[in-house]
Amino acid sequence: VKAIPAALTGKDILGCAQTGTGKTAAFAIPIIQHLQALKNRDKSIKALILTPTRELALQISECIDDYAKYTQVRHGVIFGGVNQRAQVNMLHKGVDILVATPGRLLDLMNQGYIHLDNVRHFVLDEADRMLDMGFIHDIKRLLPKLPKEKQTLFFSATMPDTIIALTNSLLKQPVKIAITPKSSTVDTIEQTVYFVEKKEKSKLLISILHKTEGQSVLVFSRTKHNADRIVRVLSKAGIGSQAIHGNKSQNARQSALENFKTGKIRVMIATDIAARGIDINELPLVINYDLPDVPETYVHRIGRTGRAGNSGTALTFCSQEERKLVSDIQK
């Protein structure tokens, strides 16, 4: 909410914000207000919101649906992994706000379906995740296509050097805002480490899942291959689960997310990149089956529980080879 007054003045914003902190409202509401005030609106795109994954693009689009419900502001969303025809038709009709993932945006620009000459507001969301997913080159290719005179709103949960360099080139005297959840990660999450042999991790997971019957559980795996293996192991133990990772089709990921959110399945196995789209307020338990290589990723992972003031539990399985990773996180 702190970002809204600054964004309404048209200033550039640099927001250090995690997922689940209400930052969509921080950029969407001011943009909708600015566009609603325009007298002569043509079909051109006036606001571009760039986000790393289809899941996030859809979530942002749903929020804009709510905020723009009683306005004349039109918006649309584009992402890869689906036929482009419906998206092209939507663009022909004209949208004021376009929510997009980088690959599909550049693709449709190269085909001549998208022009960004009239963009007044540019939002770069989850910039650090864009970096993790290798989209930074796409973004650098995109920037020269945007008008020099525009408002830029830049959000990132962490600020590594590459991101800081990008903000320096992109933002003009930005208002800096740290949007933190009401309580810090540590306050609402009980964290426990189990030191366990690598080959015993499956047994430990099955035993914990039996004890937490009825609870939704998100399990993190470092690799896609291991995520699929965990699903097979749990299935043999009579526990239903689904995996989401980059090798799954967009539709498979979307349907697995829906099943998890609605409680059709209670156990979701995810890799870090795929999990960025999971936004569930009441998730009581997160399990790190494998430790992440980077301490920030651990914070992202356990931040999936203990949301919105609810308490949560994060369990971490640590094998002999992973001891150093635990001490890095503890620092």
Where in the sequence are the language-model features?
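Conserved helicase RecA-like core
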Residues: V1-K331
